Design a protein with these regions (language model features):
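N-terminal pre-domains immediately preceding structured catalytic cores
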Residues: 1-163, 167-351
Length: 351
């Protein structure tokens, strides 16, 4: 299969418990200062939360966040482009919400090899061969934010250069996006469009919303270092990038404890397709060689635990209280788990 399914739960170093469940968020409130017309279409800076209203997509984290006036108000787990069709990086903007979109297959080898659709031959809205689902949101060629994905595709490679969501996720996202863009879009409106799957409807936002596409495999979140898998094999999990990230918070590697440094460097290697970076062992001092041996042992132990995992979390004391915000009101795309059926024993205890 071309799809690589990654585990939902991260591995956490330095603590026996997993990440705390984030508190539920609140719907955005209209705000004149949130108008993107007053916001320059420029990156907010590596590793940082934006000070304005925009969408942040970080491909290695399989995550999309909505910020309003610098506050994170909503998060989504997403599917990303396959390695041969990667999600690009850079600044885009969203100015339309298109309900029940048609799809014109592009002139690509994966379309030409298909026996179901032909290049340039329009596929109708609502057709089972249309992969875009109930909504598409253009963010600049060749990328879209669109629905149509099964829950199993969320958190995986799932598209040809787009942000992929389930239909329920993209409907939720469209309502928040519309409100930020100055357009009223009610639950009833969304339901009406879903009922009329053959009818394409374009909703134009009064204010286009900036969309920042990132490729950051290193992040500080909630006082912890998150090391994401280098999904597009861009050699980003290296010491030089770690030092740049720490420098954002006024730290250096020397500010970490020996155990923290060992765990961190092991995590970088374990989450890299091509571990390493600039490392000439012949020029290392004896002390550096000893440290490298510790890192290699930790990496080997960690790698055995990480098959299929998408991130490692390392607790670093000096980062306490710092970093990008944790997900808010996260929609994972997964169906809710049914409540456990009480056993006879628990029913007896309940009496």
């Amino acid at each position: 299969s071309d799809t690589i399914t990654l585990a939902e739960e991260p591995t956490v170093l330095g603590t026996p418990s997993l990440m705390d469940v984030p508190p539920a968020g609140t719907p955005p409130s209209p705000s004149p200062s949130a108008s993107p017309a007053k916001v320059a279409l420029t990156p907010s800076g590596p590793f940082l939360a934006p000070p304005d209203t925009r969408i942040i997509v970080n491909a290695p984290a399989h995550r999309m966040d909505i910020f309003q006036d610098g506050q994170l108000i909503k998060s989504y787990s997403i599917g990303i482009g396959y390695p041969e069709f990667p999600l690009p990086a850079g600044m885009r903007k969203a100015g339309q919400i298109i309900f029940n979109p048609t799809w014109t297959p592009p002139d690509e080898p994966w379309v030409e090899s298909s026996s179901k659709v032909k290049v340039g031959q329009k596929v109708a809205a609502g057709d089972r061969l249309n992969p875009l689902g109930v909504i598409k949101i253009p963010i600049g060629m060749p990328s879209l934010i669109h629905g149509g994905k099964q829950p199993a595709k969320i958190g995986t490679f799932a598209s040809h250069g787009c942000v992929g969501m389930t239909d329920k996720q993209v409907q939720s996202f469209a309502k928040v996006l519309a409100q930020l863009g100055g357009v009223a879009l009610s639950d009833e409106d969304v339901a009406k469009h879903e009922q009329n799957r053959k009818e394409t409807k374009v909703v134009q936002l009064k204010n286009a919303i900036p969309v920042e596409l990132r490729y950051e495999t290193l992040a500080v979140e909630g006082g912890k270092l998150h090391v994401y898998r280098d999904v597009y094999d861009r050699a980003t999990n290296v010491k030089e990038n770690l030092e740049a990230l720490l420098g954002t918070y006024g730290l250096t590697l020397a500010d970490l404890t020996e155990a923290e440094r060992t765990q961190t460097m092991a995590a970088l290697a374990a989450m890299s397709r091509q571990p390493g970076g600039k490392n000439d062992s012949a020029n290392l001092t004896e002390a550096e060689k000893a440290e490298q041996r510790k890192i290699n042992i930790a990496r080997q132990q960690l790698t055995s635990q990480l098959k299929g995992r998408k991130e490692v979390i390392v607790e670093i004391a000096a980062l306490a209280g710092k970093g990008y915000p944790a997900p808010v009101d996260l929609e994972t795309g997964k169906p809710p788990q049914p409540a456990a059926t009480p056993t006879k024993e628990t029913r007896k205890k309940g009496k």
